[in-house]
A protein has these predicted regions:
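Active-site nucleotide/adenylate-binding loops and adjacent lid/helix of ATP-dependent enzymes
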Residues: 1-5, 14, 70-77, 116-205, ...
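Generic secondary-structure signature for well-ordered alpha-helical cores
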Residues: 8-13, 134, 190-195, 224, ...
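ATP-binding N-terminal substructure of ATP-dependent carboxylate-amine bond-forming enzymes
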Residues: 1-114, 118-120, 124, 131, ...
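A short, local hydrophobic-aromatic micro-motif
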Residues: 109, 137-138, 217, 229, ...
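ATP-dependent carboxylate activation and anion-phosphoryl transfer catalytic cores
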Residues: 130-133, 249-281
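Phosphate-binding site of ATP-dependent enzymes
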Residues: 177-258, 278-280
Length: 281
């Protein structure tokens, strides 16, 4: 909504559209929709402290179609000069939507389908990082059919972090501090996906570096008020303190910016991207 407001302030006609819920009107009534943008745009509520119940969201959709795109979404996107992508999660970030728009002739912001797919797959991205000499936490991938609940049988040390392979927003992520917690962490991650990543736990400060067209922006430090940077701390206002530029020695800051630029180049994120970093103690 902030982006939409900024665009409108600069003279653009903008419709804020929910890709799943869509816009329920007859297609023949879509002519002139950008002249009715304020009437059509969805109203954005405060983000809740917990991830939404996906079953409840699907049940609330009027047409109950199995299609990811809500009513009139495709047609409205085709009518726009460009679609600004502001989606989180699997279908919004993993390249599927980008590929669909490519086939439909819809212009959109952000990276293409292939780089989006690679960036969203943590296991694949880590392999590319390793080949390029970009450091990342040590870890393994695990598929549901090869599940192993006994952490002592795996090449891991505790504490570790269990997370869905292609998820986002820290949904399904657990920091496992002892063997008794491991099975529950697997249950949680496999609830969301059939493949997950298990990594060493890095205790330290968290940072984020944006990159626009290959050039890194200043480093931001992210310090949650409580706990780690989970769903609540990411989206609930006041749950984390963000400092920019981060209080770091220049050589450390420069190295983070360099790595962020390398990540964008290796994966092919040639428009804009963001890389997260942990600086251990």
């Amino acid at each position: 909504s902030m982006v939409a407001s900024a665009l409108k302030e600069n003279g653009h006609r903008v419709i804020l559209l929910d890709v799943f819920m869509g816009y329920s009107d007859k297609e023949e009534n879509l002519d002139g929709i950008f002249d009715r943008a304020d009437e059509i745009s969805v109203k954005v509520d405060d983000i809740p402290e917990v991830a939404p119940d996906l079953a409840a969201v699907k049940a609330s959709r009027k047409d109950q179609s199995p299609c990811f795109f809500g009513p009139n979404v495709i047609r409205m996107c085709q009518m726009a000069d460009i679609v600004l992508m502001a989606l989180h999660g699997e279908n919004g970030e993993n390249g599927k939507l980008q590929a669909a728009f490519d086939l439909l002739g819809v212009k959109y912001t952000g990276s293409d389908y292939l780089s989006s797919a690679i960036a969203m797959n943590k296991g694949m991205a880590k392999q590319l990082f390793a080949s390029a000499g970009i450091p990342a936490p040590r870890g393994i991938a695990m598929k549901k059919e090869n599940r192993e609940d006994d952490v002592t049988k795996l090449p891991l040390t505790l504490p570790c972090v269990v997370k869905p392979c292609c998820g986002g927003s820290s949904i399904g992520v657990t920091i496992v501090r002892d063997a008794a917690e491991f099975k529950k962490a697997l249950d949680e991650a496999f609830h969301w996906e059939d493949e997950l990543v298990i990594e060493e736990y890095v205790k330290g400060r968290e940072f984020s570096v944006g990159v626009i067209e290959g050039k890194a922006l200043p480093v931001i430090e992210i310090a949650p008020i409580q706990g780690f940077y989970d769903y609540k701390n990411k989206y609930k206002a006041g749950s984390a303190v963000e400092t920019c530029p981060a209080d770091l020695p220049e050589e450390v800051s420069a190295q983070m910016r360099k790595y962020a630029e390398q990540v964008a180049e290796v994966i092919g994120l040639d428009t804009y991207s963001r890389s997260d970093f942990l600086l251990d103690e």
